[in-house]
């Protein structure tokens, strides 16, 4: 849900809302915007399936939804969208999660259809965002790709996002959350990819979350957090933390946790119960002006 902020608070923070009814703001050389649209039309679904070389897509794909963060001084753009996320799903190609026999019938589109789950129907993605340096048409260099864009490199680091500092009381200048895709796994659970952003006078922070629950079988949580502190003009750096968690219902039951599905509906409240299987921290140095 987008927030409404007092104009005086925005002004004192050096921020201004985007014009023409756009959702977002400009602050300290950053333009941060969320985009919203409807789910893919049947024609768009066919186009996406062709591009992704698949005959399967989530039930609800919000192809026009996006979060875009652009550093105006360098034309560096960090953005999040469903197509790139699904490209990551297709590339990773995980084996299908085994579904209880009693629930397999739910995946049939026709009563007589045989259920063959030979693909990752959970749409699990390793996606943690897209980034690029957009170059002006007059300044396209040889190292840029044909679109006039140069790629960026994340570096592994020991730095950590200061979550304690983020919990301090500070005015929220802008907050929004967008859904990229969602699938109810034929009423057998949920697969959901969302991204939300929060902008304060001192920094911006975002969370990209893939949440999967295959009822009675598996839970999977893949989260990407990014943080940027304003005022780092000499060496502007974005920190990124990736954390993957996963557990079977059987393993959680063995630890004494309840298996009631109502307990496992909110990933925010249960994340600490799921063991970490991967954790990395990286940084992105914003390049000089192109």
UniProtKB/Swiss-Prot annotation:
Pfam families: TIP41. This is TIP41-like protein. Belongs to the TIP41 family. May be involved in the regulation of the TOR signaling pathway. Indirectly activates the PP2A phosphatase via interaction with its suppressor TAP46. Could play a role in cytoskeleton functions. Widely expressed. Disulfide bonds: none annotated. Interacts with TAP46. One of its GO terms (biological process) is TOR signaling. GO terms for cellular component: cytoplasm; nucleus. Considered as a reference gene in terms of expression stability throughout development. PANTHER family: GAF/PUTATIVE CYTOSKELETAL PROTEIN, TIP41-LIKE PROTEIN.
């Amino acid at each position: 849900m987008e927030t409404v902020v007092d104009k005086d608070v925005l002004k004192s923070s050096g921020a201004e809302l985007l014009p023409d009814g756009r959702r977002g703001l400009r602050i300290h050389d950053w333009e941060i915007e969320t985009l919203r649209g409807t789910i893919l039309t049947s024609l768009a679904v066919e186009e996406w399936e062709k591009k992704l070389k698949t005959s399967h897509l989530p039930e609800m794909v919000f192809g026009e939804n996006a979060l875009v963060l652009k550093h105006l001084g360098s034309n560096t753009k960090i953005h999040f969208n469903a197509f790139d996320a699904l490209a990551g799903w297709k590339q990773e190609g995980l084996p299908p999660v085994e579904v209880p026999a009693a629930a397999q019938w739910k995946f049939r589109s026709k009563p007589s259809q045989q259920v063959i789950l030979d693909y990752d129907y959970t749409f699990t993605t390793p996606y943690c965002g897209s980034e690029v340096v957009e170059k002006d048409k007059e300044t396209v260099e040889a190292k840029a790709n044909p679109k006039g864009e140069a790629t960026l490199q994340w570096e592994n680091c020991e730095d950590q996002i200061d979550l304690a500092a983020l919990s301090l009381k500070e005015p929220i200048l802008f907050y929004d959350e967008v859904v990229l895709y969602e699938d109810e796994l034929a009423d057998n659970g949920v697969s959901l990819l969302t991204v939300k952003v929060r902008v304060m006078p001192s920094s911006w922070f975002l969370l990209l979350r893939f949440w999967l629950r295959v009822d009675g079988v598996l839970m999977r949580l893949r989260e990407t957090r990014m943080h940027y502190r304003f005022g780092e003009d000499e060496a502007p750096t974005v920190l990124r933390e990736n954390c993957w968690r996963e557990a079977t219902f059987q393993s959680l039951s063995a630890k004494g946790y309840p298996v009631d599905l109502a307990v496992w509906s909110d990933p925010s409240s249960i994340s600490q119960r799921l063991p970490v299987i991967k954790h990395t921290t990286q940084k992105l140095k914003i390049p000089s002006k192109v």
